């Protein structure tokens, strides 16, 4: 079992919360205009590709605007998710007994069987590609989630092409290496209840990196997502209508560590409950993910050993959440000197 994570000290939590509002987009969280990446003039698009590469290399995190996902669809998926969380326990319990690799799961914390640190979080997880899975109730969820999965998968695949180009590769190189035509996709709804003592903070979800390639996230207007940048925890405040994009472990592996999967966490505090909704894509489940030869040609050698994505995901999801412990297991340890 992975070693338990440490609950941040009160001082760390207070600093990270950025209650004075200093952790705003103006502090430097990169912003990527998808419209420019798809339809921009050649010189404008080249600049946007370079900026995207810097965002992946320096942050592993950015916001995307002009993404084409209707606001009405975002509101609909959030409302359907709220409705699911309000269902009687009897109508959800078959999914509450699910194991980490089951296609539909409803639960609390990260994986309550092994959680080392209590996390104030309710979640719905449903695999949506290559096969779509959805709870029967609420009845409207299936149609909404199907459309949402399709829209956000297309968005993430467009970003993947641009990220491939930012590495100096052909736009389809990452897709080819990771078999993204059969990519894995999961939708996740998160509910973080308000604290009983609004003056205190608690962990909604401890520090971790995501197991996949790219994660797309939006929230209900209540802040709480924090990212680690240059050793500091920053409160991520979104631009109106934007998505957060989070680089995951598979991007770090396939780029041989050039692009980093960012550490992030959810902090709960205040009188309002927080909700977020996530769409994550990863390689085809049976693909062995390893550094691209082009990324290991700089003399550094391989930073990671190859691992089948299904095995990596199961390892990360079945153990206590603890920063980058799963990634460290596949990291190659080089001899000094």
Curated annotation (Swiss-Prot):
Subcellular location: Cytoplasm
Fe2OG dioxygenase domain: residues covered: 179-283
Inducing stimuli: Induced by cadmium.
Activity response to pH changes: Optimum pH is 7.4.
Keywords for this protein: Cytoplasm, Dioxygenase, Iron, Metal-binding, Oxidoreductase, Vitamin C
Any coiled-coil regions, as ranges: none
Enzyme category, top tier: oxidoreductase
Temperature dependence as stated in the record: Optimum temperature is 45 degrees Celsius.
Tissues and organs where the protein is expressed, per its UniProt entry: Expressed in shoots.
Superkingdom, natural source: Eukaryota
Annotated residues for binding of 2-oxoglutarate: 274
CC cofactor note: Binds 1 Fe(2+) ion per subunit.
GO molecular function, one term: metal ion binding
Matching PANTHER family: OXOGLUTARATE/IRON-DEPENDENT DIOXYGENASE
Name of the protein this chain belongs to: 2-oxoglutarate-dependent dioxygenase 19
Organism: Oryza sativa subsp. japonica
């Amino acid at each position: 079992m992975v070693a338990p994570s440490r609950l941040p000290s009160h001082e760390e939590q207070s600093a990270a919360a950025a209650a004075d509002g200093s952790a705003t987009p103006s502090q430097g969280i990169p912003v990527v205009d998808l419209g420019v990446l798809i339809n921009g003039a050649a010189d404008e698009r080249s600049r946007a590709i370079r900026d995207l590469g810097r965002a992946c290399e320096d942050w592993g995190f950015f916001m995307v605007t002009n993404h084409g996902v209707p606001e009405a669809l975002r509101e609909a998926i959030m409302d359907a998710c709220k409705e699911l969380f309000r269902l009687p326990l009897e109508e959800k319990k078959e999914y509450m007994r699910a194991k980490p690799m089951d296609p539909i799961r409803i639960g609390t914390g990260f994986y309550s069987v092994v959680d080392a640190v209590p996390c104030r979080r309710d979640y719905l997880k449903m695999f949506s590609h290559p096969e779509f899975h959805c709870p029967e109730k609420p009845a409207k969820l299936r149609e909404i989630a199907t459309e949402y999965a399709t829209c956000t998968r297309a968005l993430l695949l467009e970003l993947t092409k641009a990220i491939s180009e930012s590495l100096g590769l052909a736009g389809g190189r990452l897709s080819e290496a990771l078999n993204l035509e059969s990519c894995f996709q999961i939708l996740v709804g998160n509910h973080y209840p308000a604290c009983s003592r609004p003056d205190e903070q608690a962990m909604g979800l401890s520090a971790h990196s995501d197991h996949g390639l790219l994660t797309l996230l939006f929230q209900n207007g209540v802040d709480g997502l924090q990212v680690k940048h240059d050793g500091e925890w920053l409160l991520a405040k979104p631009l109106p209508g934007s998505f957060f994009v989070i680089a995951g472990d598979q991007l770090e592996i396939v780029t041989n560590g050039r692009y980093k999967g960012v550490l992030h966490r959810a902090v709960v505090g205040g009188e309002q409950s927080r909700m977020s909704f996530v769409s994550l894509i990863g390689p085809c489940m049976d693909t062995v993910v390893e550094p691209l030869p082009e990324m290991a040609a700089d003399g550094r050698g391989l930073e990671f050993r190859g691992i089948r994505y299904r095995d990596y995901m199961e390892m990360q999801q079945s153990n206590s959440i603890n920063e980058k412990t799963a990634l460290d297991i596949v990291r190659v340890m080089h001899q000094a000197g």
